[in-house]
């Protein structure tokens, strides 16, 4: 899932610590929402929602329909600004590769969002259907239920889900640290290479000067 370059959402900034928009960005998003709301009902129906997501993402028709059903909590065929705001935060978190951190910071809302039946647990099927929203790979999904389904009922309650988000965040931080260390190591190797080039260049100049003096 990717945002369309140059679309309105491309210019919104998400705080990387709390995974929320600033008040200024929320106000801008609210104005944008009202522009999309051509019927002036303070809601977006499925048609408006489809055209919006088709314009700002590369999601297909089936995925857009699934997201609408996920956000239409009261099953009235419309979503309000609150649901719209949640969606935008998810899209921006995905764009900034903050999916794990977003789930950790907002574990309760995400859990309630994926708990489609309202039974205070999430099944593997729900995760499978919506894993594209949080960039969860198939193997990660299998590992999730193998490692965190403590009760063994193939369902995650909130505590199990929270443990999963903590683990993912720690893993993500460790992955970023290792990537940063590798980049630093490459930079050091580049500097060593530059120093060696300088040394060889100076050595060449010095040898040339000695040769010139011997001729004289």
Swiss-Prot record:
Ca(2+) 1 binds at residues 60, 62, 69. It is found in: Cytoplasm; Cell projection, Cilium, Flagellum. Its main location: cytoplasm. This is EF-hand calcium-binding domain-containing protein 9. Component of the CatSper complex or CatSpermasome composed of the core pore-forming members CATSPER1, CATSPER2, CATSPER3 and CATSPER4 as well as auxiliary members CATSPERB, CATSPERG2, CATSPERD, CATSPERE, CATSPERZ, C2CD6/CATSPERT, SLCO6C1, TMEM249, TMEM262 and EFCAB9. HSPA1 may be an additional auxiliary complex member. The core complex members CATSPER1, CATSPER2, CATSPER3 and CATSPER4 form a heterotetrameric channel. One of its GO terms (cellular component) is sperm principal piece. The gene is Efcab9. Residues 59-94, 100-135, 136-171 form the EF-hand domain.
């Amino acid at each position: 899932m990717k945002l369309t370059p140059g679309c309105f959402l491309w210019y919104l900034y998400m705080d990387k610590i709390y995974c929320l928009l600033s008040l200024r960005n929320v106000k801008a998003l609210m104005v944008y929402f009202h522009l999309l709301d051509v019927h002036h009902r303070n809601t977006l129906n499925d048609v408006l929602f489809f055209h919006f997501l088709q314009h700002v993402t590369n999601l297909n028709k089936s995925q857009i329909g699934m997201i609408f059903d996920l956000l239409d909590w009261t099953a009235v065929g419309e979503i309000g600004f609150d649901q719209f705001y949640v969606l935008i935060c998810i899209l921006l978190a995905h764009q900034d590769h903050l999916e794990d951190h977003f789930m950790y910071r907002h574990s309760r809302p995400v859990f309630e969002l994926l708990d489609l039946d309202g039974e205070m647990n999430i099944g593997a099927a729900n995760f499978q259907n919506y894993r594209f929203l949080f960039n969860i790979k198939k193997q990660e999904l299998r590992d999730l239920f193998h490692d965190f389904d403590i009760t063994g009922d193939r369902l995650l309650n909130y505590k199990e889900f929270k443990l999963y988000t903590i683990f993912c965040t720690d893993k993500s931080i460790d992955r970023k640290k290792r990537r940063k260390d590798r980049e630093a190591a490459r930079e050091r190797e580049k500097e060593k290479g530059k120093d060696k080039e300088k040394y060889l260049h100076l050595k060449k100049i010095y040898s040339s000067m000695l040769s010139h003096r011997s001729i004289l």
